Amino acid sequence: MGKIQLGYWILVLFIVTWSDLGLCKKPKPRPGGGWNSGGSNRYPGQPGSPGGNRYPGWGHPQGGGTNWGQPHPGGSNWGQPHPGGSSWGQPHGGSNWGQGGYNKWKPDKPKTNLKHVAGAAAAGAVVGGLGGYMLGSAMSRPVIHFGNEYEDRYYRENQYRYPNQVMYRPIDQYSSQNNFVHDCVNITVKQHTTTTTTKGENFTETDIKIMERVVEQMCITQYQAEYEAAAQRAYNMAFFSAPPVTLLFLSFLIFLIVS
């Protein structure tokens, strides 16, 4: 008799527990398709495709210039002052919070430690002021062959100048892996070149070309890691959000075993 009562209590507890877990909403990550699927090259600067930079929308010298960050006719420059506009890393016009005759108290500016930022990267630390981008974990720079001896040697000798972390948004905000990688490369290279240029170091066209290839491989690695993590979370949620009929069947089996 005592064993039957124990079985009933276990059955009730099991049903209540699984009912609560069944209310959880299953996430629906939207990972994209395979890399370079569809048979076409999405980035026209790769070997075997027409020459040129694969991410031409920013930072590349126009009119035959060689150094990144120099003024371009008719365009804007990262890290350079723009008439009537604002620049990365440059003072912006307008009013500042905490100044003027209304607020006497001014909070201290927080100190940012880059080591702390890198340490939080594994948890997907959100980078402030960059529209919700996260900083990925530090990676070893990939081994890449560029198809000619000069660029291979240049990369080996200068790879320390290139980033070892990427910036990205969650993969469920992109329709495909290609879109994720393209955005990841753009924001990572922009941020790195802007930060480095403000320290007085410029980048040549060769630097930009090599950096894009390196960061692209790192962004692919980051996407794969995010995709696997999202798939694991979806699997766990699917298990705990099983249909009520399945839960009742499992509860009945446990009741029979206990009884």
From Swiss-Prot:
Intrachain S-S bonds: 184-219
Start and end residues of each stretch annotated as Interaction with GRB2, ERI3 and SYN1: 25-235
Endpoints of the signal sequence: 1-24
Primary subcellular site in the record, as a coarse category: membrane
SUPFAM superfamilies to which the protein is assigned, alphabetical: Prion-like
Positions bound to Cu(2+) 4: 92, 94
Disease: Found in high quantity in the brain of humans and animals infected with degenerative neurological diseases such as kuru, Creutzfeldt-Jakob disease (CJD), Gerstmann-Straussler syndrome (GSS), scrapie, bovine spongiform encephalopathy (BSE), transmissible mink encephalopathy (TME), etc.
Quaternary structure annotation from Swiss-Prot or TrEMBL: Monomer and homodimer. Has a tendency to aggregate into amyloid fibrils containing a cross-beta spine, formed by a steric zipper of superposed beta-strands. Soluble oligomers may represent an intermediate stage on the path to fibril formation. Copper binding may promote oligomerization. Interacts with GRB2, APP, ERI3/PRNPIP and SYN1. Mislocalized cytosolically exposed PrP interacts with MGRN1; this interaction alters MGRN1 subcellular location and causes lysosomal enlargement. Interacts with KIAA1191.
Entry's family note: Belongs to the prion family.
Name recorded for this polypeptide: Major prion protein
UniProt organism field: Trichosurus vulpecula
Classification of source organism: Eukaryota, Metazoa, Chordata, Craniata, Vertebrata
